[in-house]
């Protein structure tokens, strides 16, 4: 099985941060420190591949599974801990950027590939994200602010 984590960040939800089936990708490669509630915090973003999720540098139909946990903040201070930890998205361009990312992910997925999508609705409702994708998930958690959703690549025949 080949897995791609498109926006790995600091690999927060991975139990094994060097999971052998997984290629970790992120546009950022950096170590940040910031104050968070009076404590200095450090976050290291060290992907295997540094690339933008709107231009995934892999051949068509490479991965069985893609994990997509993109930044969800349009409003965050540039030096804030949350902005450094999660990254931010552009208020005006995020729908276009997400549409492009979704197309790229589907291109990189094998015909029976699966997309696991994670989202936090704190600033943008998940329905708006699905509208940008142009596709509904087959299942997902709709009860909390943070959403996990699973997509299957559609057969193009």
For each feature predicted by the language model, list its residue ranges:
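Class I S-adenosyl-L-methionine-dependent methyltransferase catalytic core
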Residues: 1-157
């Amino acid at each position: 099985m080949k897995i791609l984590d498109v926006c790995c960040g600091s690999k927060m939800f991975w139990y094994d941060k060097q999971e052998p089936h997984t290629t970790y990708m992120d546009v950022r490669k950096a170590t940040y420190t910031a104050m968070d509630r009076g404590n200095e915090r450090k976050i290291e973003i060290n992907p295997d591949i540094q690339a933008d999720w709107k231009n995934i540098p892999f051949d068509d139909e490479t991965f069985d599974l893609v994990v997509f946990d993109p930044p969800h903040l349009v409003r965050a201070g540039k030096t804030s801990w949350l902005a450094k930890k999660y990254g931010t998205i552009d208020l005006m361009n995020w729908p276009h950027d997400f549409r492009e990312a979704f197309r790229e992910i589907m291109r990189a997925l094998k015909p029976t590939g699966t997309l696991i999508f994670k989202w936090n609705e704190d600033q943008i409702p998940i329905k708006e994200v699905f509208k940008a994708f142009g596709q509904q998930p087959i299942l997902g958690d709709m009860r909390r602010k943070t959403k996990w959703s699973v997509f299957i690549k559609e057969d193009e025949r």
